[in-house]
């Protein structure tokens, strides 16, 4: 049975002190609550070790927002998957549309990141999604399937089964626009069908696919009610416990 997951992505927000306070506040808010999903927070690199040490990581998983596509060496400013794992983080977001757009991350680069994350015991949260022009041209299914195939389909079945996927229609990120629950379901089902064709139904049905793109307390319950939507990758709303908690409780 695949897991329901709500993962926050703080992006480039919060100083170390602010991030630590937010993580502790969320940890305290979840204590004693019965929740029906796994909770993850994706934080900037500088927060990882402090937050992993300060909260109950059986209650909240900690994720990096990126990792390098190289193992180690003379790559000034980069942070390796091994370094991320050494902080106590257990997850890493890979392939977010902002990384693809602003830092020109291609499928071959992302493939290396995924492999290094897996070899260091991290669970990748791999992001895919189309821009508005691609959707309006009717190419959204083709684009998203290609993103999955090019970066991930060299993995063997065992490694692929360790992944979490996140569908984020780029036109809905931070814009206030949201894919309808039916649009999200349609794409998630398409992704699952592509996985089944490559790895079989058992692997496809075991893969959690999250929705990312202006998901909030008002629309989370409807989105999460769809058969192939297994949770959310939450941006802005994850920066406030008051906004993040209702999304967690939408399951």
Swiss-Prot record:
<dbReference type="Pfam" id="PF00121">
    <property type="entry name" value="TIM"/>
</dbReference>
<keyword id="KW-0312">Gluconeogenesis</keyword>
<dbReference type="GO" id="GO:0004807">
    <property type="term" value="F:triose-phosphate isomerase activity"/>
</dbReference>
<comment type="pathway">
    <text>Carbohydrate degradation; glycolysis; D-glyceraldehyde 3-phosphate from glycerone phosphate: step 1/1.</text>
</comment>
<feature type="active site" description="Electrophile">
    <location>
        <position position="96"/>
    </location>
</feature>
<feature type="binding site">
    <location>
        <position position="214"/>
    </location>
    <ligand>
        <name>substrate</name>
    </ligand>
</feature>
<comment type="subunit">
    <text>Homodimer.</text>
</comment>
<dbReference type="GO" id="GO:0046166">
    <property type="term" value="P:glyceraldehyde-3-phosphate biosynthetic process"/>
</dbReference>
<feature type="binding site">
    <location>
        <position position="174"/>
    </location>
    <ligand>
        <name>substrate</name>
    </ligand>
</feature>
<keyword id="KW-0324">Glycolysis</keyword>
<dbReference type="GO" id="GO:0006096">
    <property type="term" value="P:glycolytic process"/>
</dbReference>
<comment type="function">
    <text>Involved in the gluconeogenesis. Catalyzes stereospecifically the conversion of dihydroxyacetone phosphate (DHAP) to D-glyceraldehyde-3-phosphate (G3P).</text>
</comment>
<feature type="binding site">
    <location>
        <begin position="9"/>
        <end position="11"/>
    </location>
    <ligand>
        <name>substrate</name>
    </ligand>
</feature>
<feature type="binding site">
    <location>
        <begin position="235"/>
        <end position="236"/>
    </location>
    <ligand>
        <name>substrate</name>
    </ligand>
</feature>
<comment type="pathway">
    <text>Carbohydrate biosynthesis; gluconeogenesis.</text>
</comment>
<dbReference type="InterPro" id="IPR000652">
    <property type="entry name" value="Triosephosphate_isomerase"/>
</dbReference>
<dbReference type="InterPro" id="IPR035990">
    <property type="entry name" value="TIM_sf"/>
</dbReference>
<dbReference type="InterPro" id="IPR022896">
    <property type="entry name" value="TrioseP_Isoase_bac/euk"/>
</dbReference>
<comment type="similarity">
    <text>Belongs to the triosephosphate isomerase family.</text>
</comment>
<feature type="active site" description="Proton acceptor">
    <location>
        <position position="168"/>
    </location>
</feature>
<keyword id="KW-0413">Isomerase</keyword>
<dbReference type="InterPro" id="IPR020861">
    <property type="entry name" value="Triosephosphate_isomerase_AS"/>
</dbReference>
<dbReference type="GO" id="GO:0005829">
    <property type="term" value="C:cytosol"/>
</dbReference>
<protein>
    <recommendedName>
        <fullName>Triosephosphate isomerase</fullName>
        <ecNumber>5.3.1.1</ecNumber>
    </recommendedName>
</protein>
<dbReference type="GO" id="GO:0019563">
    <property type="term" value="P:glycerol catabolic process"/>
</dbReference>
<dbReference type="InterPro" id="IPR013785">
    <property type="entry name" value="Aldolase_TIM"/>
</dbReference>
<keyword id="KW-0963">Cytoplasm</keyword>
<dbReference type="GO" id="GO:0006094">
    <property type="term" value="P:gluconeogenesis"/>
</dbReference>
């Amino acid at each position: 049975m695949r897991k329901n997951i709500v993962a926050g992505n703080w992006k480039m927000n919060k100083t170390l002190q602010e991030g630590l306070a937010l993580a502790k506040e969320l940890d305290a808010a979840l204590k004693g609550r019965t929740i029906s999903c796994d909770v993850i927070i994706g934080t900037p690199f500088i927060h990882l070790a402090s937050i992993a040490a300060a909260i109950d990581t059986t209650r909240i998983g900690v994720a990096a927002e990126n990792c390098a596509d190289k193992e180690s060496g003379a790559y000034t400013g980069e942070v390796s998957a091994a370094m991320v794992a050494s902080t106590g983080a257990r997850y890493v977001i890979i392939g977010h549309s902002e990384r693809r757009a602003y830092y020109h991350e291609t499928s071959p680069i992302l493939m290396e990141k995924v492999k290094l994350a897996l070899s260091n015991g991290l669970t990748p949260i791999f992001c895919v999604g189309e821009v508005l022009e691609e959707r309006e041209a009717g190419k959204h299914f083709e684009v998203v399937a290609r993103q999955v195939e090019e970066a991930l389909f060299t993995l063997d079945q065992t490694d692929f089964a360790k992944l979490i996927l996140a569908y984020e229609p780029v036109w809905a990120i931070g814009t206030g626009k949201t894919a309808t629950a039916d649009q999200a379901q349609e794409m998630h089902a398409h992704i699952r069908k592509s996985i089944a064709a490559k790895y079989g139904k058992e692997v496809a049905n075991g893969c959690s696919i999250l929705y990312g793109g202006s998901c909030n307390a008002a629309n989370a319950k409807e989105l999460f009610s769809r058969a192939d939507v297994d949770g959310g990758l939450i941006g802005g709303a994850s920066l406030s416990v008051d906004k993040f908690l209702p999304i967690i409780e939408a399951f």
